[in-house]
Amino acid sequence: MKKFSSKTIKAKNSVKMTALSTRAIAANLILQVLDEGKSLSALIPEVQLSVKAQDLPLLQEICFGVCRVLPRLEQIIKRLVDKPLKGKTRIVHCLLLVGLYQLLYMRVPAHAAVDEVVNATKSLKSDSFRGLVNAVLRRFLREQDEILAIIDKNWQTLHPEWFVNKLKKAYPNWREIIEANNQKPPMWLRVNSQKNALETYRTLLEEQGVSSKTSHHPNALCLDIPIAVQKLPHFEEGAVTVQDLSAQWAATLLEPKNEEWILDACAAPGGKTTHILELAPQANVIALDVESHRLKRVEENLERLNQQAIVVCGDASKPDEWLAEIGKSAAKFDRILLDAPCSATGVIRRHPDIKWLRKETDIAQLVELQKKILSALWEKLKPNGVLLYATCSVLPEENCEQIQAFLNAHADAELLSLPFSDDKSAVGFQFIPQPNSGDGFYYAKLLKRAS
């Protein structure tokens, strides 16, 4: 099989987003994920103004798709290009990833996909690569069956080895988690019970030709086919919120009551804050997050649902600082929702770039941060108050092991049972990602005993 050489070709990989094609922008974003450790969730909003509205779904599909199946695409390139495209030529490597993803996974005519990617070399100031890109993609089309037979001979996880090893240790059904992660996520809605009954809103969807199914959660609907949020009936009026099924249990398990003081720690982007206020509209809610720019999303969601909360920028591990700033130094809370900073390994199917951004060394640091926040907020919980600990992780060290260590260190902490857990010996409850169901999520509900 012929390989193509890149050894005599040079290109720049620093390009402006203006006037770039969608494929060129996708290659640039993928480059920033792989080489600079940036997340697609942060990058895509930054370039939305540079992309036509009708092309934004294409950009998202390419970027998230490439990250989802990255190892497979990398192996194909390795078989077709004899020398790695490094340094200033990395942008062309990412452009090949874009082209191969389209050829393998998208309903784009092969000739059109190749032509678009080849033409993108010019706007990326890599026109000297035009011939290489064209030759690699066209040879792949000719020899696709042979190449894939070799690459796919062994079962591929499409995940980093360190993560697979952790799953094998923790879960007998670890392959199910891997397979769910490699699929596109379902679109779940949370129906605002202050506006509509679940079946009433489901009927509104059906009237627009949108089919859905219910679940074991009283406010959740799963769309059979995802649609743009702008097409959801009465979305702007706050009738519905896009939120994963597993995440919808947070406010439900917290059981907020009107007039209570409730802290939503690590609140951005505000899905759980608004759900708390749907369940208890007269509750006094503080929505806290350490990143000020992410709190803008909280404020936007509160405004859309016509709700009120105290939105605070502060470090959850240092509550005395931000409580003093808002004039509530002596305040203690009836309930605390701690959706702790975590590895996000339970939401890989929604954010496949996590597979390549997260490092094994991150886990110990996150565990220590969770421990610090948990202990600090426990001091701000009233006697007989409830703290709900949550993560979107599937790793035991962040979840059941973290909570067991906390229980061992705090005699006033009592683990409460959860309605969907039959195992009385379990420390909290772990959702794993499943097709047509929720993401990976962990919950533990703690009562602070009165002394």
From Swiss-Prot:
InterPro entries: MeTrfase_RsmB-F_NOP2_cat (IPR049560), MeTrfase_RsmB-F_NOP2_dom (IPR001678), NusB-like_sf (IPR035926), NusB_RsmB_TIM44 (IPR006027), RCMT (IPR023267), rRNA_ssu_MeTfrase_B (IPR004573), RsmB-like_ferredoxin (IPR054728), RsmB-like_N (IPR048019)
Cell location: Cytoplasm
Catalytic activity reported: cytidine(967) in 16S rRNA + S-adenosyl-L-methionine = 5-methylcytidine(967) in 16S rRNA + S-adenosyl-L-homocysteine + H(+)
Coiled-coil positions: none
NCBIfam families (alphabetical): PRK10901.1 (NF008149), PRK14902.1 (NF011494), rsmB (TIGR00563)
Stated name of the protein: Ribosomal RNA small subunit methyltransferase B
Binding residues for S-adenosyl-L-methionine: C266, A267, A268, P269, G270, G271, K272, D289, D315, D339
GO biological process: regulation of DNA-templated transcription; rRNA base methylation
UniProt EC number: 2.1.1.176
Stated family: Belongs to the class I-like SAM-binding methyltransferase superfamily. RsmB/NOP family.
Molecular function GO terms recorded: RNA binding; rRNA (cytosine-C5-)-methyltransferase activity
Record keyword Nucleus present: no
Active-site residues, record numbering mapped to chain: C392
Broad class of enzyme this protein falls into: transferase
